[in-house]
Amino acid sequence: MSISKPSQEQLSKLIKYFQDRQFVDAEKLAVSITKEFPEHQFTWKVLGVILIQVGRLNESLTATQKSIELNPTDSEAHYNLGVILKGLDRSNEAEKSYRQAITLKPNYAEAHNNLGNILQELGRSNEAEKSFRQAIVLKPDFTEAHNNLAITLQELHKLNEAEKSFRQVIALRPDYAEAHSNLGITLKELGQLKEAEKSYRKAISLKPGFTEVHNNLGLTLQNLRRLDEAEKSYRKAIALKPDFTEAHSNLGITLKELGRLDEAESSYRKAISLKPDFAEAHNNLGNTLQELGRLDEAEKIFRQAIALKPDFAEAHNNLGKNLYKLGNKDLALESIEKANNIDPQFQDARLLLKVMKSRKSREESENATGDTNNKCTKTGLTSNPLILNRVVEKELIANLYEMSSRELDKTIDARYGNGKCSPDFNLFQDSRSIIQNVAKDLTKIMMEAVKSEVYIIGSFFNILSAGGGSNPHNHLNDLDKDIGFDLGKQKYSLVYYLSVGDQHCNEPGILKLYEPSEDILPCEGMITIIPASRMHSAVYGGKTDRVMIGANFYSL
């Protein structure tokens, strides 16, 4: 006895309606067929998909479950059930459905991809990575899976792999604006700011109204110190989306750096009006008010930032700085200590804590002895360079070449040209015994030079090849220039020449000092210490590398 089923004409018409996106007609026909042929599994499955398309997920769930009941081995039906359950925020059940689809059809690339999405949503990124990779193995040109893999790798901080995956996405689909945007984000995290800029601009050319990319481009331009361009990008983002809170806040940061404090204040207040619990915007507003000399207002704003985010180390630190300027030194020290306790790696808080404790100890000593002479700047150093020497271990140079590095041209500071440098400013924290030995020796030399304890704020190495160098610069940052603390007078820069390279050339790498002008031709083992405020530059053109270690430090 044959089982009755719909005619081929009915099924062809149903499929045609669906393919032409005539979902109303498709639903009517599917419902009609299921009433006439209630055991016809395929029609129930199609009805479920139609209802997904029109957003009626609960009804779709019923139809799809019916199709699975009629044919439990239909992998596509289990896949559809996973889609529905995910849409209903039932992720754990969706995972089971996708896994069942894969069990029934192991080479089901789309199911592997969607399983990866669910695992990512559930916070199981390592498992998600495996699912996306399996989808790609099964379907190498699966653009969506490549993109999902890249995003997962980005979140797992496997940035080099993420970059490769995003580039693969773009190779498969050159007009995919989101992939260009995500590549830009990855490149920015890798410190490749100029390349990130190119990716963002490509995304914008493909999708001019891509608001988030205008904002991200602004952040990159800001990091490249192209502040006028950054301002334009933020304003474009705001024009596209007037309630874009982050763009208003970022615009405020740029305007402050441009010295347009009143405008910066307005931008921060706009961001706060859009998002009253935006602790970072409160903190930035406090900094602007502080710079405008409105210290009482700044204190209130910093306290609001802390109320919104009690573990906000930067806000505690800024409150401490503000209280110090108001003359409340004990309360200031308490705030700085809180910042340091919250984030022991917060460089500014660590520095200020050292400086403030040192100053307090000195003041107490002076008050006890009656000696009120200010010894803060009696370091034994003037604006003139101090020239010293240390024997260079050859293995020290070899170790620097073995360490991870970045190209000079990839930095955003004064360094440029051929050569490489340490990836960060924490060279002295490297555990190699040879590095620890040189750090110990140089620290002792610093202390003897300034006649006090010291706090090292940064340490690094530079390896200059022909054409490498540094533009005129000094080593003062915003905190050093803050007249409330006057730290610039306590800051010094040291350079230790391990190998001077080839000095028989037109550009032998003279250390050029400014105001007053002075030229120093380095020799092997030379250590030069100058005030961090003194401008200096160097250009090197030799055939062999010049190798040096640098450090910036404060006298305490």
Feature annotation, model-predicted:
Residues 6-36, 46-49:
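Alpha-helical segment of the N-proximal tetratricopeptide repeat
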